[in-house]
Amino acid sequence: MFVDQVKISLKAGDGGNGITAYRREKYVPFGGPAGGDGGKGASVVFEVDEGLRTLLDFRYQRHFKAKKGENGQSSNMHGRNAEDLVLKVPPGTIIKSVESEEVLADLVEDGQRAIVARGGRGGRGNSRFATPRNPAPDFSENGEPGEELEVTLELKLLADVGLVGFPSVGKSTLLSIVSKAKPKIGAYHFTTIKPNLGVVSTPDHRSFVMADLPGLIEGASDGVGLGHQFLRHVERTKVIVHMIDMSGSEGRNPLDDYKIINQELINYKQRLEDRPQIIVANKMDLPDSQGNLSHFKEQLDNDVTVVPVSTITRDNIDQLLYQIADKLEEVKDVDFSVEEDENLGVNRVLYKHTPSADKFTISRDDDGAYVVSGNAIERMFKMTDFNSDPAVRRFARQMRSMGIDDALRERGCSNGDIVRILGGEFEFVE
């Protein structure tokens, strides 16, 4: 089964907790702090495996949770870092955030890796907080929570050649006779509803990968007939082979078919207009094909390649394969990892956005309580051990140093008012 799009949930591992411990050794009366740091939590990493061709594995498992780092130990021994969770994906996989629709990774080459959810760092043990004023601190840090997010995996096939055209023009039949692929073939529209790949070898021993893409119809660039799902696979082909029913057996005009499909390609991605294209005039064994072909060529520019074939009688198939192989040799390698944002008119690579750590916001709940939120303060909250009074006092000092106390006063917060951070509730004290 071919699966080219799926939504999954990721949870990176939390960092291990640091611990509060002291050196207890005979004849060492003031041994000092000896609490070790926690280990780093495992990250969720995606890696390209060129042996994969589909996202089928993610259809049956949608939730992935990486391991937590080990807690620190006494004698200043650090906890072990957790081993990253590596998820294998096929070449051509794009990973997007469900929340922001931002591209987090674009994986093209075999072995290429991307960290999508980072594991939390380990909490610090009490020996890390020793100072001349406080040589034996009696608090430590909890591990940092690992990142958690939902992502969409989208597969854009990496094929040398993409077959496009209206339904029932002979794309699947062509793939079946030039490769060992076994696509479903039927005398009705949309027999092919998922792309099929085949390795093609020419009589002069050149080879390339050909993708049989589901049939397109007018309006495909707007999503008609699942057009977006089909068109995205065209983006990463080096050469487009445009198949046309030159007999007009479906009651359509071959020239109109050609113009409609090309317009849909351009509407979907403007840069597809410049992609090398070979026109295959199929069904030349049927009546009216020769006359239609002559009229068709008269309407085209001289530099457009048109190859007449019959996938039923197999006439001129070898010549078509030679033409495709020659065209591929002319085409330079295309860097598919850089996507062009046509709305902005610039080339850019999108990386994951890391929010500013210092900003925070203050709002009011319905009951009048003040709610403080922000990446840095929430991270500190999660890493504070609220069972330890010294750790709580340290958290209060951090809030003051960030300017949160002053900001609360400016918002009208006074002695005894309730302040909330995530699931915690505090009383404001002047």
From Swiss-Prot:
It holds the Pfam family MMR_HSR1. It is found in: Cytoplasm. Keywords: Cytoplasm, GTP-binding, Hydrolase, Magnesium, Metal-binding, Nucleotide-binding. One of its GO terms (cellular component) is cytoplasm. The keyword ATP-binding does not apply. Signal peptide: none annotated. Residues 352-430 form the OCT domain. GO terms for biological process: ribosome biogenesis. Belongs to the TRAFAC class OBG-HflX-like GTPase superfamily. OBG GTPase family. This is GTPase Obg. It comes from Staphylococcus epidermidis (strain ATCC 12228 / FDA PCI 1200).
